């Protein structure tokens, strides 16, 4: 289990100066050729997403104005807050800030032939499945994960195991990304 606080994470500026990324975790850890990766990006200007052949990307707008995603003849999609959207990471996708203001989004990328992610917003206590990896990011409220208290802009990632996330207040929202390994693959085979 790895814990993080977005406010204390290192920031990587994009080469095109249109934004920045905070990498949460990769699996396998510290590998450039990852099977899955979670990150938070701040987008300051219109531009294209980086290409990642063989990967799927699920992007969830956390804050800021809506973002229009365009991919030639494949799709035009308006990304709205807390509504995950998946697309192939090897296609050219342009992002346009519809309200002209900076936006922040959560990204999870998975290698299509190894694993698949599912992203949802939780508003009540839940328990993860034991054989799956995952990432949680607190949008608001206070959540208990084991003996650790997680509050706004904090989270955790894990590569397997069963975990209960308990909402400690009447209201709260948490982004949860679950990683499902495809047949013939598991985290034990990779490490």
From Swiss-Prot:
SUPFAM superfamilies: RmlC-like cupins. Gene3D superfamilies: Jelly Rolls. It holds the Pfam family HutD. InterPro entries: RmlC-like_jellyroll, RmlC_Cupin_sf, Uncharacterised_HutD/Ves, Uncharacterised_Ves. Belongs to the Ves family. This is Protein Ves. It comes from Shigella boydii serotype 18 (strain CDC 3083-94 / BS512).
